[in-house]
Amino acid sequence: MIDLNADLGEGFGRWTLTDDDALLSVVTSANVACGFHAGDPSVMRRVCDLAAERGVRIGAQVSYRDLAGFGRRAMDVPSDELAAEVAYQIGALRVFAEAAGAPVAYVKPHGALYNRTVHDEGQARAVVAGVRLAGGALPVLGLPGSRLLTAAAEAGLTGVPEAFADRAYTAEGSLVPRSEAGSVVTDEDAVVRRALAFAVEGSVEAVDGTAVAVAARSLCVHGDTPNAARIAARVREALETAGVGIGAFA
């Protein structure tokens, strides 16, 4: 059994980026932007309404406060401040999720914050502290072996390892930085093959050609890549054809 997640609600005002309606017909978990890198109250409400209507689990996609940089710029935020900002974002999304009759079911950092918490124990602990501050014991999505998942487990939270079908991996099992050529896999057939490899074999081919073991409970297909909805649909169809069960982890 594997979960399919995608980043949704990444727009604000008259600007839109992701095809939320189409993706919500495919994925089982929606990482909803909470206003710090994208998303505004109207967008958050609409995505929560659609997700609840279709039985898709709602997750808080928390970020550094970086609208101009789409949450992808490296920042140094004091731990107490970051914890408060994470809790704030979860709380904001919770209002709209509960109004739609659904809970916020998990938390996933976005962009630079996600990458930072792979190696930075202080920032990882701050994210976990923010999850705790927001109340409940929400699962946390992160890269296998990351400081974030370790910090979550130490705090009594469930750490959920995920894989990225449309991102390139290093031989060490980390994501190739977006600043490097080839970091995003855009060939649709390749994305489908990689998704199957993750789900069936528990591994993926790294940029140097070696096989990297990746034990994932959730598979991410980014919503902001070209033809994202079509790729996600192809991934789901291929997984189901291979006999892989599809279902939310939370």
UniProtKB/Swiss-Prot annotation:
Which UniProt keywords are listed?
ATP-binding, Hydrolase, Nucleotide-binding
- List, alphabetically, the InterPro entries matched: Glyco_hydro/deAcase_b/a-brl, LamB/YcsF/PxpA-like
- EC numbers: 3.5.2.9
Key word Transmembrane helix present: no
Q: Which GO terms describe its biological process?
A: carbohydrate metabolic process
- What Gene3D superfamilies does its record include? Glycoside hydrolase/deacetylase
Catalyzed chemical reaction(s): 5-oxo-L-proline + ATP + 2 H2O = L-glutamate + ADP + phosphate + H(+)
GO function terms (MF aspect): 5-oxoprolinase (ATP-hydrolyzing) activity; ATP binding
Pfam families referenced in this protein's UniProt entry, alphabetically:
LamB_YcsF (PF03746)
Q: Reply yes or no: does the keyword Nucleotide-binding apply.
A: yes
Q: Which family does this protein fall into?
A: Belongs to the LamB/PxpA family.
Report the protein's function: Catalyzes the cleavage of 5-oxoproline to form L-glutamate coupled to the hydrolysis of ATP to ADP and inorganic phosphate.
Xref: PANTHER family: 5-OXOPROLINASE SUBUNIT A (PTHR30292:SF0), UNCHARACTERIZED PROTEIN YBGL-RELATED (PTHR30292)
Subunit organization: Forms a complex composed of PxpA, PxpB and PxpC.
Q: Indicate what this protein is called per its UniProt record.
A: 5-oxoprolinase subunit A
Organism for this UniProt entry:
Streptomyces coelicolor (strain ATCC BAA-471 / A3(2) / M145)
- Organism phylogeny: Bacteria, Bacillati, Actinomycetota, Actinomycetes, Kitasatosporales
What's the name of its gene? pxpA
